[in-house]
Amino acid sequence: MEIFPAIDLKEGRCVRLYQGEFSKETVMNEDPVAQAIIFETFGAKRLHIVDLDGAVAGESLNLSVIERICKAVRIPVQVGGGIRSLVSVEKLFSVGVDKVILGTAALYDKPFLEETVRLYKEKIIVGIDAKNGFVATRGWLDVSEISYIDLAKQMEKIGVQTIVFTDISKDGTLAGPNVEQLELLQKNVATRVIASGGIASIQDVKKLNDMNIYGVIIGKALYEKTIDLEEVLEVTKLC
């Protein structure tokens, strides 16, 4: 199982949100580059970065910070948030990003998604964020009428190999992941699934590992120290 420490960027800082609410923000580190280096120092093999400003604006607004992070660490970095054009995708790859996560564009711009998957194959990940089982977009501000399962099936047909699934109601809560929704997702698609939202303990991670979940994104639990990064990396290595 892959462990992805999370860095959420807002106005150039590393923050955490509660249930996706921009008004419920906590600054975790004023310097996200320093935070990335900390994660790498403690053994992280990869990083998950979300440009929250970009997710709302529809274009990357923290590109310079992302570039500095990519230059500061030697581990692969995957980035999502506001990536809705081929130019944005190419810019991220040009500054050293390893994989790009598409969210809103996956729902509303299928030709763009198909083209990026054709060009970059496994380097393109789709992020599916769900609220009460329905896909949320544009920085979680809009909720669609399409179920997360239906969108996942569409993504699989297009050739997407990896999906990041987030249950928004769990995000930033330390309430544990939505196991039921993850199980349903696993039953319906054969794509790799990276779980995000609510991870609070080593036990949560072990449970997801037992479900054959490909990867886990851990944010608040690392900052609040309910999960020790070195320990969880060791545990998943032994599983």
Swiss-Prot record:
* Pfam families registered for this protein in UniProt: His_biosynth
Task: List locations, semicolon-separated.
Answer: Cytoplasm
Listed pathway(s) = Amino-acid biosynthesis; L-histidine biosynthesis; L-histidine from 5-phospho-alpha-D-ribose 1-diphosphate: step 4/9
Annotated Gene Ontology MF terms?
A: 1-(5-phosphoribosyl)-5-[(5-phosphoribosylamino)methylideneamino]imidazole-4-carboxamide isomerase activity
Catalysed reaction(s) here are: 1-(5-phospho-beta-D-ribosyl)-5-[(5-phospho-beta-D-ribosylamino)methylideneamino]imidazole-4-carboxamide = 5-[(5-phospho-1-deoxy-D-ribulos-1-ylimino)methylamino]-1-(5-phospho-beta-D-ribosyl)imidazole-4-carboxamide
Question: Active-site residues?
Answer: D8, D129
Q: Can you cite an annotated GO cellular component?
A: cytoplasm
Q: Coiled coil located at which positions? A: none
Q: Does the keyword Manganese apply?
A: no
Q: What is its EC number?
A: 5.3.1.16
Q: Which GO terms describe its biological process?
A: L-histidine biosynthetic process; L-tryptophan biosynthetic process
Keyword line: Amino-acid biosynthesis, Cytoplasm, Histidine biosynthesis, Isomerase
Give the protein family.
Answer: Belongs to the HisA/HisF family.
Question: NCBIfam families under this entry?
Answer: 1-(5-phosphoribosyl)-5-[(5-phosphoribosylamino)methylideneamino]imidazole-4-carboxamide isomerase
Q: What is this protein called?
A: 1-(5-phosphoribosyl)-5-[(5-phosphoribosylamino)methylideneamino] imidazole-4-carboxamide isomerase
The organism of origin for this protein:
Bacillus cereus (strain Q1)
